[in-house]
A protein has these predicted regions:
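Generic secondary-structure boundary/loop-capping signal
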Residues: 1-4, 51, 58, 80
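Conserved pre-motif I regulatory segment
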Residues: 1-45
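Conserved nucleic-acid-binding Ia/Ib motif block in the N-terminal RecA-like helicase ATPase lobe
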Residues: 6, 11-22, 69-110
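Walker A/P-loop NTP-binding motif
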Residues: 30-42, 53-69, 85, 90-94
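The conserved Walker
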Residues: 46-50
């Protein structure tokens, strides 16, 4: 199993991951993070609690940290308000040491 330091994640994102208490990536993280860092689209399927949010967010935030210019660079869509809140909380933890600005919106109803 790899270590998070073996990925080309930004130092700030690695600090956030360490603060969260994670040592080793899960299988979905091992597979997804390198592709996301290469700015490839990824569709991943894994059970609840396996770290999918950390997988996509760590790569996305690292890419944004490396190329920060204060314009919108990332959009995450979620099917439920509850999942938006969960993703928001995780991204704030992962990105706590970055200088990135996060804005979360939820739109629901038709």
């Amino acid at each position: 199993m790899k270590k998070f330091e073996e990925f080309d994640l930004s130092i700030e994102v690695l600090q956030g991951i360490r603060k969260m208490g994670y040592q080793n990536p899960t299988k979905i993280q091992e597979q997804a993070i390198p592709l996301i860092l290469q700015k490839q689209d990824v569709i991943g399927l894994a059970q609840t609690g396996t770290g999918k949010t950390l997988a996509f967010a760590s790569g996305m935030l690292s890419n944004l940290t490396f190329n920060y210019d204060k314009i919108i660079k990332g959009v995450i869509l979620s099917p439920t308000r509850e999942l938006v809140i969960q993703i928001e909380n995780e991204i704030k933890k992962i990105g706590v040491f970055t200088s990135l600005f996060f804005n979360f919106l939820d739109f629901f109803g038709m």
